[in-house]
């Protein structure tokens, strides 16, 4: 029985899941819009939203925690200098998940994950 067990396994080992969501979070913060499967998108929320909440209070300790979770100095800079300030007054719900049909190969449900209030300009291709 899996009573009170949170999270999805996604047919991966725990280390693979951790690395995958770390990479997906970095891609999301870099491009501000990514396309992935719906179950991965829903799990990505649990990784990405706490990082934005962490970035709302700029301190050395919080920057080190963010670097530990993303392993990217550029993304840590963007989190604290741009995204933390952008969402300073928002109490959560920084991501929007939009369903976008099914993948051709295996009919998996697909979704766009985007940052709410992101600047919209030109033709932006989502990161896959």
UniProtKB/Swiss-Prot annotation:
InterPro entries, per the entry: Ribosomal_bL17, Ribosomal_bL17_CS, Ribosomal_bL17_sf
Taxonomic placement: Bacteria, Pseudomonadati, Pseudomonadota, Gammaproteobacteria, Pseudomonadales
Protein family membership: Belongs to the bacterial ribosomal protein bL17 family.
Membrane-spanning parts: none
Statement: the UniProt record of this protein carries the keyword Ribosomal protein: yes
Designated name of the protein: Large ribosomal subunit protein bL17
NCBIfam families per the UniProt record, alphabetical: L17
Pfam family, one: Ribosomal_L17
PROSITE patterns cross-referenced by the UniProt entry: RIBOSOMAL_L17
SUPFAM superfamilies in the cross-refs: Prokaryotic ribosomal protein L17
Keywords, ordered alphabetically: Ribonucleoprotein, Ribosomal protein
Self-association state and partner proteins as the record states: Part of the 50S ribosomal subunit. Contacts protein L32.
Swiss-Prot/TrEMBL GO biological process terms: translation
Origin species: Pseudomonas savastanoi pv. phaseolicola (strain 1448A / Race 6) (Pseudomonas syringae pv. phaseolicola (strain 1448A / Race 6))
Superkingdom of source: Bacteria
């Amino acid at each position: 029985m899996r009573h009170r067990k949170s999270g999805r396994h996604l047919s991966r080992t725990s280390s693979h899941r951790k690395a995958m969501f770390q990479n997906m979070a970095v891609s999301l913060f870099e491009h501000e819009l990514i396309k992935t499967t719906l179950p991965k998108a829903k799990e990505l929320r649990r990784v990405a939203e706490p990082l934005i909440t962490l970035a709302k209070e700029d301190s050395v300790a919080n920057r080190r925690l963010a670097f530990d979770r993303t392993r990217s100095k550029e993304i840590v800079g963007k989190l604290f200098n741009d995204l933390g300030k952008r969402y300073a007054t928002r109490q959560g719900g920084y991501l929007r998940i939009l369903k976008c049909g099914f993948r051709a190969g295996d009919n998996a449900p697909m979704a766009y994950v985007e940052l709410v209030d992101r600047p919209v300009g030109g033709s932006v291709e989502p990161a896959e």
